[in-house]
Amino acid sequence: MYNSNSYIPDLVEIQRQGFFYLLEKGIIEEISKRNPITCFEKQIEIFFYPQYYRLTKPFYSIQQAIFYKKSYVSKFYIPVQLTDRKTKRIFLKWILLAHFPLMTNRGHFLLNGSARVIINQLVRSPGIYFRENMHEIFSNKWSEKPSTTFRRFYADIICLKGTWLRIECDKDFSMWAKMKKGPKIPLLWFLLGMGLSEKYILNSVYKPMNLLQSFTKEMEKMQKSKSSKELKYPYISSTKQAWEQIQKLFKLKKTLRKFSFLKKNEEKPKTFIFGQSSTKIEAKVVFSDFAAFNNSVKRENTVFASNDDTFLVQTSFETKKKKNTRKKENFQKNKTQKTTKLSLQNKEKRVASKLEAYELGRKWFANKFMNPRTYDLGKQGRWLINKKLGLTIPLEQTTLTALDVLTATDSLMKIEDGFFEIDDIDHLKNKRVRTAGEALQEIFSIGLIRLEKSIRLKLNGNGQQSFFQKTSFFNFDSLMSTRPINGAFREFFGTHPLSQFMDQINPLAEITHKRRLSSLGPGGVSRDTATLAIRGIHPSHYGRICPIETPEGKNTGLVNSITTYSKISFHGYLESPFYKVYKGQVQRNLGVFYLSPDKDDHFQTATPDLNLTPLGFLPKKPIPVRIGKRFVRMKTHKLALMGVSPLQMISVATSFIPFLEHDDANRALMGSNMQRQAVPLIRPERPLIGTGLEARVVSDSGHAILAKTSGYIVYSSGSKIYLYTI
């Protein structure tokens, strides 16, 4: 039987808390990122004031929305200022931006009369993670065991939006920066491109020679490729990228036999046979679409000049005979395979200075990692990076900085020598919960991007002047449309895998659905490729994720339930309540202390089912204690924390099973899942054997009638209840 002095938190608070954060801060953050919207010439500026937005009273109540099969939404109004710099006129008006879906008191949404629930998603928290990689070298392909095995470490910088960055160390201890797409580059180049000086970089890291090794390797590789290119193709001298594009486009080794081009002030075109001419021509690839200008029966590439410094290259298919015919005259028509435009320039014109190349590199890095529109760590990611690397960068700085990469490089070098430990990616301190509010905030951001594109299209169109020729606000209203944001919400609730039709078989099924935790969906793992390490039970799950309730089949371990007492912190981490213990006495009068997963490994935690004296003292004999992953026996005066209830480690559905400690784990899993499939009785009655949580689940689910004030019930019937209050 359930018996505890601790108070069970609201079972649907997780859903309401996420939506409340969206209304309080999330909407303002997303609109502020898009301010202001300007046209191409920046003569017209549109500015939103998100802190003054208003939501109207819903047109349909909850009961009416269900009865008429309508949506429970509110009109979203926001003040918008439009400034015309050319005529120096300012317009300010409240604009209807969208029909915003509202959450009911029971923690779900109503769309077209149907109740829908947004599942909480458990994903890897944005930040930095240090991992190890085992390299095995076999003496030959038939050997069973590797002849040499060595460890190397790497760091992953994960973001909410943008490109993931990996800093790795190869077998020669050279440092490289690597992205998902593209080749790896020396880490020294990466740091230089982010704006740091070479002297500052080498003086700030633990082992500067590791940075110089990768830099030296890349320079030697470039010198070799440059010398071999000039010997193999003596008639052309171009940048490496230009030559690779020419090879990719025209497959020179297979199809090109002759190069014919017409230079300026020459009458006849010169023809160069592939690989034999010694004439050098500076080439730079310029991509553009051109119509076919020649069809040649021969398999060759022909080049003609189109103006002073450009020429066209055309590749044509070889003429082939049609199949299933005896006539020799029937041939297929020639079709141009590819036509592209190349520009010829003198060597003196295209010599770029080192300063220009440096500025181009800086622009690329700034757009890739320092632009808030293309890269976003989020406040949680910035907080985690600051905590791990010991930085004090403000939480508002959600893009990557040069100091982040430099400090991560220094930490990675120290991990090689054993100064720090690597991260456990399955630990809950490296995972966070994306609530319903965050999912809606992301969809709202997508709708704002669509709205911004439509506004820019209208402002940059031919009818740009028509918006400001009249003094009426009619044309100003036509700039704004509710379709982009409404369409984004409609797509999310209709097609997103985390938006599900609410399970309404019984009150327990409804509560469990709203407290579900899924690792699937966009940004998560796939059920087909998830390993046992992801599905398994981790010691950090204690008091946070139920080890029993999970589906059977492919979703085992990927879909879980939050425990009865757990709650979600501001940063999205699952926290579990504990009592503080001082010199063997449990300090219940101080209330509960919520412990985050990152602090779980540093405290000695006792089980909550110990017998206490009337004054709250623990037994004097050694008791079982958990310290991180280990279970030991320890004297009570060394304890720091104690659990609040035996129900702390299991979910709501599992806590409905009487005498759970005598049940087999596999049967308990099936029982917790099958309880949600029970249909309600026509004549409700109390269970013969219960655990004491039944009434709480019914009240929190919203199925029971709740009195707004306390008092005495003086009369009750099937139609009314009289409550007497003082």
Swiss-Prot record:
Predominant cellular place of this UniProt entry's protein: plastid
One GO process term, biological-process aspect: DNA-templated transcription
Transcription keyword on record: yes
Enzyme nomenclature, EC number: 2.7.7.6
The entry's keywords: Chloroplast, DNA-directed RNA polymerase, Nucleotidyltransferase, Plastid, Transcription, Transferase
Molecular function terms from GO: DNA binding; DNA-directed RNA polymerase activity; ribonucleoside binding
Catalytic activity, as annotated: RNA(n) + a ribonucleoside 5'-triphosphate = RNA(n+1) + diphosphate
The keyword Nucleotidyltransferase appears for this protein: yes
Subcellular localization(s) per the UniProt record: Plastid, Chloroplast
A Pfam family reported for this protein in Swiss-Prot or TrEMBL: RNA_pol_Rpb2_3
Record's GO cellular component terms: chloroplast; DNA-directed RNA polymerase complex; mitochondrion
Subunit structure: In plastids the minimal PEP RNA polymerase catalytic core is composed of four subunits: alpha, beta, beta', and beta''. When a (nuclear-encoded) sigma factor is associated with the core the holoenzyme is formed, which can initiate transcription.
Miscellaneous notes: In S.obliquus the gene for this protein is split in two.
Protein family membership: Belongs to the RNA polymerase beta chain family.
Its biological purpose: DNA-dependent RNA polymerase catalyzes the transcription of DNA into RNA using the four ribonucleoside triphosphates as substrates.
Protein name per the record: DNA-directed RNA polymerase subunit beta N-terminal section
Organism: Tetradesmus obliquus (Green alga)
Gene name per UniProt: rpoB1
